[in-house]
């Protein structure tokens, strides 16, 4: 039977697995991000499709890291010469050369670190962004599904390029509850991906505190003094951190 209880059991199992099996990987990722930010770097988060929600979770939110910038397909319209119509096709993430266009529109510095999110880990924009980051000497953290990416018939995957891989635990196809006539319902990659993102933030914040330094964290804009606090921190980064989503 498929109902909310069935999904809740599946989701709880996926969360439990992430908290135990990926603990070391998330710790290593936290060390990479901490080292980058402490050196004046910015976390560059990139995802396409529903993986954008995980990149968004890492950027521009209350309790999140201020030096974190979301790269996205939207950038070629926001900051480049593409029209909104050009980016409406969800298959655009498979377009060769798209990652390079996004890269050229961003203010990426040598000390920056990348978190790239993709369940399949195989679409052209994702793999090319990882290649670009590695080629330019950046550390790359992947949040991906090892089960799904292993089934992709491609020459290179995100997991092959990343310095640290966090497995979101999603099954092949992402949806986790099998249907009687074939196929499955109810995805889990966003759930575990967002959790992995917040666990990563916690690791970074903890390292700042252990070093006796205030963590560069956003306050809610809907609290007294929040806007002023955030503006002071954002001023350090200028155009390197773009808060483009309303």
Give residue spans per PLM region.
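Internal, active-site/partner-interface "lid" segment
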Residues: 174-177, 195, 206-232
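Glycine-rich phosphate-binding loops that contact phosphosugars or nucleotide phosphates
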Residues: 45-198, 202
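A short, well-structured juxtamembrane/interface segment
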Residues: 21-38
């Amino acid at each position: 039977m498929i109902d909310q209880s069935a999904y809740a059991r599946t989701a709880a199992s996926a969360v439990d697995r992430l908290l135990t099996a990926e603990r070391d990987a998330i710790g290593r990722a936290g060390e990479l991000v901490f080292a980058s930010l402490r050196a004046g770097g910015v976390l560059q988060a990139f995802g396409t499709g529903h993986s954008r929600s995980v990149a968004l979770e890492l950027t521009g939110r209350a309790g999140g890291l201020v030096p974190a910038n979301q790269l996205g397909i939207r950038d070629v319209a926001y900051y480049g010469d593409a029209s909104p119509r050009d980016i409406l096709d969800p298959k655009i993430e498979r377009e060769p050369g798209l990652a390079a266009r996004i890269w050229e529109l961003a203010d990426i510095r040598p000390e920056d670190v990348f978190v790239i999110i993709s369940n399949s880990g195989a679409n052209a924009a994702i793999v090319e962004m990882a290649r670009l980051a590695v080629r330019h000497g950046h550390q790359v953290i992947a949040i991906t599904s090892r089960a799904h990416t292993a089934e992709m018939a491609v020459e290179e995957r995100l997991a092959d390029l990343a310095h640290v891989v966090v497995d979101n635990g999603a099954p092949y196809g992402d949806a986790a509850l099998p249907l009687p006539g074939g196929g499955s319902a109810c995805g889990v990659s966003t759930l575990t991906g967002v959790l992995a993102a917040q666990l990563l933030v916690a690791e970074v914040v903890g390292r700042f505190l252990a070093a006796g330094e205030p963590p560069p964290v956003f306050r809610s804009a809907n609290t007294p003094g929040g806007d002023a606090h955030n503006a002071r921190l954002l001023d350090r980064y200028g155009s390197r951190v773009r808060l483009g989503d309303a």
